[in-house]
């Protein structure tokens, strides 16, 4: 009994150890941070973003439709089998009695003595006895298996335009997919750098809070040395305490932004993210006129609208062809019918072959050619939609030119601002260091330190914001022209 108890306890301890190890591993995985560069973030988004996955399905649907667009030329075919029963035996008897082939049948049958019971003394037919000899019973004579195999095929010149339209729809889908990918990349990059900016802002605020704490403690030292009044200590402490709620709010906002960023990357909720990188940027030389002339045709909006114009034109051509050209229809059918259900169904003497072949060339509706018909009115609507699309294309070119010049101007101004702000940060840092040193020596008021630190923080944040603006302008320009600037 003791040995069993010992074994049971050993097993229980082993399970507990495994569970503890698993719990430790789960906690470890949960606490692990995913370290991402901007390129890593983009790759995660392209692989896992739900919107892109949905767009990929749309593209796959259009790709498959384009690959098999030729199936519009396939004929339709049907195969059926019917077991038909007649409700009128008298009709069958009359058919037997009046059959032109029946005398020959009787002659052969009389020779064989197969149907001698079906003839009376003067040679008239007894149809009931003949049916019994042929089918075995009147019920069997009522049943007839019938097969049916039919093919039909139709063609109109508009079908060729339909195939062309399917191809253009797939090409439009490719443009839309490329646009979705580009927009995802840009949004992820902007959000990535936006988070870096928020992190730097939080870092500056925490540094300011540490400085405020240091000034508070320095004020206490100065108070004990008798160089400053008690009010200076209290003011320093209040300044320090007032910073805590602001920093807590900034930390919470940054946490929520990272969670949203993780969702856009397709990461599980709760995944901790650590972004690595800087908001510093390398400059690019741009010439608005050259960029517009060279790359405007690569603009995804322009390419998409051009493809839409092609689709409208294809639809107009298809309407013309379906209206003013005839349609060809070919139909072929076979209908074998078994004569005697009790005999071999595949015996060529036991079934009759029915069927037909028809070839038709026709206009579906002549009234569709009339100018007042709904068909022609729809055609006019399509032409006006085409005119609107062409006007929209001209506007896109104009807007693209304006945007390219605007973004290039923004880059030039932003670049100049960055250079000026870098110098300003250097000066603000020197001013703050001097003011802080004087405050620690008791020759400057706390207000002067606050003003100096505020100026330094504004200069640093301004520089980071301007760097972010420059990066955003580069990304917008790359998106507008669908290129990568180097």
State each model region's role.
Residues 2-5, 36, 175-298, 410, ...:
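Periplasmic alpha-helical coiled-coil/stalk elements that build and connect Gram-negative outer-membrane
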Residues 4, 24-31, 85-91, 96-104, ...:
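Acidic, low-complexity, intrinsically disordered peripheral segments
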Residues 9-18:
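Bacterial N-terminal signal peptides
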Residues 23-90, 95, 167, 269-310, ...:
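Bacterial Sec-pathway N-terminal export signals of envelope proteins
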Residues 29-33, 80-155, 276-283, 317, ...:
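Small/polar, glycine/serine/threonine/aspartate-rich low-complexity segments that form flexible
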Residues 53-57, 70, 139, 154-181, ...:
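Sec/SRP-type N-terminal targeting helices
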Residues 223-227, 439-443, 480:
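A short glycine-centered flexible hinge/capping loop motif at secondary-structure junctions
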């Amino acid at each position: 009994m003791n040995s069993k108890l010992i074994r049971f306890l050993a097993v229980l301890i082993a399970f507990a150890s495994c569970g503890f190890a698993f719990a430790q591993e789960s906690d470890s995985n949960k606490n692990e941070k995913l370290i991402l560069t901007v390129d890593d973030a983009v790759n995660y988004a392209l692989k896992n973003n739900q919107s892109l996955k949905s767009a990929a399905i749309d593209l796959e649907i259009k790709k498959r439709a384009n690959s098999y667009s030729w199936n519009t030329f396939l004929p339709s075919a049907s195969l059926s089998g019917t077991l038909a029963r007649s409700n009128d035996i008298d009709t069958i008897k009359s058919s037997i009695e009046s059959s032109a082939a029946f005398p020959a049948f009787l002659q052969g049958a009389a020779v064989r003595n197969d149907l001698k019971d079906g003839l009376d003394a003067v040679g008239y037919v007894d149809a009931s006895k003949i049916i019994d000899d042929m089918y075995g019973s009147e019920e069997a004579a009522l049943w007839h298996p019938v097969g049916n195999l039919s093919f039909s095929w139709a063609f109109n010149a508009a079908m060729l335009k339909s195939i062309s339209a399917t191809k253009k729809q797939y090409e439009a889908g490719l443009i839309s997919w490329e646009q979705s990918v580009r927009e995802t990349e840009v949004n992820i990059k902007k959000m990535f750098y936006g988070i870096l900016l928020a992190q730097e802002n939080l870092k500056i605020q925490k540094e300011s809070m540490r400085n405020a704490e240091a000034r508070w403690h320095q004020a206490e030292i100065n108070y004990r040395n008798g160089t400053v009044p008690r009010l200076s200590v209290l003011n320093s402490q209040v300044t320090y305490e007032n910073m805590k709620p602001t920093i807590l709010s900034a930390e919470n906002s940054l946490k929520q932004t990272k969670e949203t960023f993780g969702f856009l990357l397709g990461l599980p909720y709760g995944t901790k993210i650590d972004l690595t990188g800087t908001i510093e940027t390398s400059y690019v030389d741009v010439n608005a006129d050259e960029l517009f002339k060279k790359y405007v045709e690569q603009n995804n909006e322009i390419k998409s609208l051009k493809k839409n114009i092609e689709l409208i034109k294809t639809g107009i051509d298809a309407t013309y062809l379906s209206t003013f050209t005839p349609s060809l229809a070919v139909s072929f059918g076979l209908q074998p019918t078994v004569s005697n259900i009790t005999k071999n169904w595949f015996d060529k003497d036991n079934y009759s072959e029915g069927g037909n072949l028809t070839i038709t060339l026709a206009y579906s509706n002549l009234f569709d050619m009339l100018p007042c018909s709904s068909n022609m009115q729809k055609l006019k609507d399509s032409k006006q939609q085409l005119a609107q699309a062409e006007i929209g294309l001209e506007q896109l070119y104009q807007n693209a030119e304006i945007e390219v010049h605007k973004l290039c101007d923004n880059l030039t101004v932003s670049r100049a601002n960055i250079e000026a702000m870098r110098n300003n940060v250097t000066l603000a840092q020197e001013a703050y260091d001097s003011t802080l040193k004087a405050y620690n020596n008791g020759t400057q008021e706390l207000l002067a330190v606050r003003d100096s630190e505020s100026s330094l923080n504004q200069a640093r944040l301004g520089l980071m914001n301007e760097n972010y603006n420059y990066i955003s302008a580069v990304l917008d320009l790359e998106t507008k022209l669908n290129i990568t600037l180097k």
